[in-house]
Amino acid sequence: MRGEIISVGTELLLGQILNTNAKYLSEKLALLGIDIYFHTNVGDNEERLKECLNIAFNRSDLIITTGGLGPTVDDITKETVASFLGLPLVENIEAKEEIIRFFEKIGQTPTMNNFKQAFFPEGAKILPNKNGTAPGCIIEKDNKIIIILPGPPSELIPMFEESVYPYLKSKTNETIKSRVIKIFGLGESKVEEMVKPLLFNSNPTVAPLVGDGYVTLRITAKGHDDKEILEMIEDMESRIRGIIGDYIYAVDEEEMEEVVIKLLQKNKLTLAVSESCTGGLLAKKITDVSGASKVFNLGVVSYSNEAKENILGVRKSTLESYGAVSHETAKEMAENIRKLANADFGLSTTGIAGPTGGTPEKPVGLVYVGFATNEKVYVKKLMLSGDRSKIRTRTVLHALDIVRRYLLGIKID
């Protein structure tokens, strides 16, 4: 089934609201094997909405509209769809009674314009709205399906899951499932080059995407049997792992910090961190993970040289000779936080996140990450690009990846 989404609302065109509905719907429809080829945003204008409907009606089997179901004069979606299809608007008594009950619950009386929301194109299947006053509806005409949904996500999402998803599932006999392989330490172009033959596969498909400092490969398989689909995905994942190897750090929703915490817990080891350029972001990422308290002993943000010297015990001579952003300082920060916290590992970050502070010798983006065990200290020099936020985020990923690699017995690059 070929589908598209028309999002109605001038506020979307003005950038006042982020269109999260289109993202949500596309993801859910993909699971049903429905291919979404077009997203359209249109303002609260009858003629322009009709133009969009005309285009969509000629190229798609399924058209979903979102927004424009409120009680005000600029809420025109149902009226415009009805006019486009040549259908009269008919009052639905159950919907009207539901609107009255909704207002009774909140101790208010509906105004006459609220009852506009109880009118639907003739023959439409009504979609109840348990979270608002704007029911949706489904219209089947000329072998096409038009689904009209409210704009607020708090209303659209429950309506879709309770009413629309089961309806569409009955109309399709194909399922799509995806798996996301997360890769760190290789750029997008390198990953694409390595897996290039797989990118031409038709089922399952493999698509590279860039995250914030990492790369993903999305495997998407389509079929009629869940077991068959899962086997296709697992076979493709195995092929990708054979090519990419240890640069793969997680699958689907799992994040780098979760991987590291699980490895520390599994090995009953502890970690402490001393941060400069990341300003507490590393500790935050770690403590975002439930159960981190079992393996995370201490986090120190030693932003100034005085803090590095007085709290962490970095030697004054080191700071004077090499500076705060140096191999030597990162080494001492990692060593000393490990000892201070009585932890198995110490992890440090020091660098120039910008936009100011760089010099020809030490430009913005220069970062050192230190990792201390009871036997050895590793220091990794990085030259990172991007704004201040990106440099900090990427530094944290590099730092956590060093710990991951060490715990898995993988060479630290």
Curated annotation (Swiss-Prot):
SMART domains in alphabetical order: MoCF_biosynth
Question: What is the gene called?
Answer: cinA
Which Cys-Cys disulfides exist here? none
The Swiss-Prot or TrEMBL record describes its family as follows: Belongs to the CinA family.
Q: What is this protein called?
A: Putative competence-damage inducible protein
Source organism of this protein record: Thermoanaerobacter pseudethanolicus (strain ATCC 33223 / 39E)
InterPro entries attached to this UniProt entry: CinA, CinA-like_C, CinA_C, CinA_KH, Competence-induced_CinA, MoaB/Mog-like_dom_sf, MoaB/Mog_dom
